[in-house]
């Protein structure tokens, strides 16, 4: 298909926007998180409008999603269920898995390893749920102690069953709202919201 002319970014965004608008249907309820519900399509619209720099639309769409995914779903009690076989109120859309998402991750060799090393500047408090679910103490081949980051990696290493791959979750929607606020000249509101999310 090399002979076909390439569409511009604007044309692509316009076409995707049209398709997402057509896909919206309030009757498409979220009976199961691995169904593409109306709210999951709304999440995709937020991503598209943020990419397009249409910040008023991002704020409007996230305001609509806020009724289903209020700030309260950002808490540790809800968060921990995102990486389990339990339902989570913070999961907007998740790919259903019958097997582990990763079948062969190597932590024992540098050449075949899957490394995402946390900066020493990042330090979770002991009671922070992100530490429990995301942080992996590790010794590098040069005997240096580091901390790896990766929820699915840790679940695989610890042989914890993974039922969902989280494609869209409430925290993503709220972070897109933070960015839209900041880029709309509402830096104070953006900082206040980000700080509430970090509590």
Locate predicted features.
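Structured, solvent-exposed acidic/aromatic patches
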Residues: 1-173, 183-189
């Amino acid at each position: 298909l090399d002979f076909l002319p390439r569409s511009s970014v604007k044309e692509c965004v316009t076409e995707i926007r049209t398709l997402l608008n057509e896909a919206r249907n309030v009757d498409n309820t979220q009976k199961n998180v691995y169904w593409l519900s109306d709210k999951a399509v709304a999440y995709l619209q937020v991503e598209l409008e943020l990419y397009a720099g249409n910040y008023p639309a991002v704020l409007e769409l996230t305001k609509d999603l806020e009724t289903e995914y209020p700030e309260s779903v950002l808490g540790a009690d809800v968060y921990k269920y995102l990486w389990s076989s339990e339902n989570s109120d913070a999961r907007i859309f998740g790919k259903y898995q019958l097997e582990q998402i990763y079948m062969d991750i190597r932590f024992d060799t540098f050449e075949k390893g899957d490394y995402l090393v946390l900066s020493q500047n990042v330090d979770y408090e002991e009671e922070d749920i992100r530490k429990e679910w995301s942080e992996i103490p590790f010794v590098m081949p040069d005997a240096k102690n580091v901390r790896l980051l990766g929820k699915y990696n840790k679940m695989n290493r610890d042989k914890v069953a993974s039922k969902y791959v989280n494609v869209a979750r409430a925290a993503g929607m709220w972070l897109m709202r933070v960015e839209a606020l900041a880029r709309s000249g509402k830096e104070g509101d953006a900082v206040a919201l980000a700080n509430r999310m970090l509590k």
